[in-house]
């Protein structure tokens, strides 16, 4: 059977034929790095990691892009709050933290979470702040085509004119009249309350480091514009797959599609959206207290079991967490690992790998993955192979056990279950990287405070690091750090 995916834009499961034979291009939305990653972020990353692994398993050469939104209202607001009198500083949110240091620190926290769960790095991981010229070019194309205009209030904002694009709403199948107003700027400068910001003029009190000069005045890019500019830079004007969480369909992806198509780009041929994570059947909410973080999950189960849990549902389905769910995932992973260990100990030797990875999995597994990435059915094939392998071992049929071992190892490779750091490897990798990134961000904030002659803040950062057992040593080439003896 041909590879098929559910395309959000057409609301149909369609045959997938890559734009370029033998290759595939995938863009999926990364994080706005304003805080620590939550399980929804990590589930989405695992979903698209499995997608990319499967496409590669079929023999395609995949170019993947996952962006980092490192300039945004939420990032600036959180940084601004840390400079206010009475701000209650903490280890997670220190006082007087520059916006760029905050964004970098949390970007590294996301990296650590991804690496801890075996999510491979994409081919490209561009930051929004590094692609402002590309955003200028996209705005200019939209203006030339009559789809964008400067704000009418002199604010320096630039808006996309939704009424000028008759296909606006095609991704989510909504009429403009039924949509919520765009909340991203003061509506007084808009022609229509649904128009959304492509460029946001600088506001009084905003840091100079968060402002770029543009043909329309100083300011910064809008969120939706960033993804359109970065995806097409690395993948071209038309590419195969655009992915992200279900919560991004509107307004983010709707606006991305509109501005890109209106600028003349073919843009994404397929739109894939993964379902959200709930807790006991309810939406996670800090106010209700029914949340769990990736860090907490990793404290309750091994990384491989956490990855299994977050990747086990159909990607379009809601994934529900409940107490005991990770214990169940741990037991399943142990059964898989138990079979592979017993098979090798018994002398079962799988045949040498030959051909594409997708050719070495059972037919039922391949059929499931080709059917809109049906991971639950693929896992059923994996568990059947484990059961058959255990039966072969019990009957001392090493040839059959070896054949099943080869299938199991091929399937776990596709699902990324064989690529999760465990034990000392896990501790030495993502955790140490995260610690280094966190400490360096504080050292950079201290250096900025010293440059500003803000000695109180510089001393406060130094003392906080010392209290945590970190020794900062100033040298001619800058500051370095080490753990206290």
Curated annotation (Swiss-Prot):
Basic and acidic residues bias locations: 185-197
Binding site for Zn(2+): 29, 227, 252, 256
Cofactor detail note: Binds 1 zinc ion per subunit.
Pfam families listed in its UniProt record: CysS_C (PF23493), DALR_2 (PF09190), tRNA-synt_1e (PF01406)
GO cellular component, one term: cytosol
Compartments, record wording: Cytoplasm
GO BP term, pick one: cysteinyl-tRNA aminoacylation
Binding site for ATP: 286
Catalytic activity: tRNA(Cys) + L-cysteine + ATP = L-cysteinyl-tRNA(Cys) + AMP + diphosphate
Region Disordered: start-end pairs: 174-198
UniProt cofactor(s): Zn(2+)
Molecular function via GO: ATP binding; cysteine-tRNA ligase activity; zinc ion binding
Keyword terms: Aminoacyl-tRNA synthetase, ATP-binding, Cytoplasm, Ligase, Metal-binding, Nucleotide-binding, Protein biosynthesis, Zinc
Motif ('KMSKS' region): 283-287
EC number from the UniProt entry: 6.1.1.16
Main location: cytoplasm
Subunit structure: Monomer.
This protein's name: Cysteine--tRNA ligase
Species of the source: Micrococcus luteus (strain ATCC 4698 / DSM 20030 / JCM 1464 / CCM 169 / CCUG 5858 / IAM 1056 / NBRC 3333 / NCIMB 9278 / NCTC 2665 / VKM Ac-2230) (Micrococcus lysodeikticus)
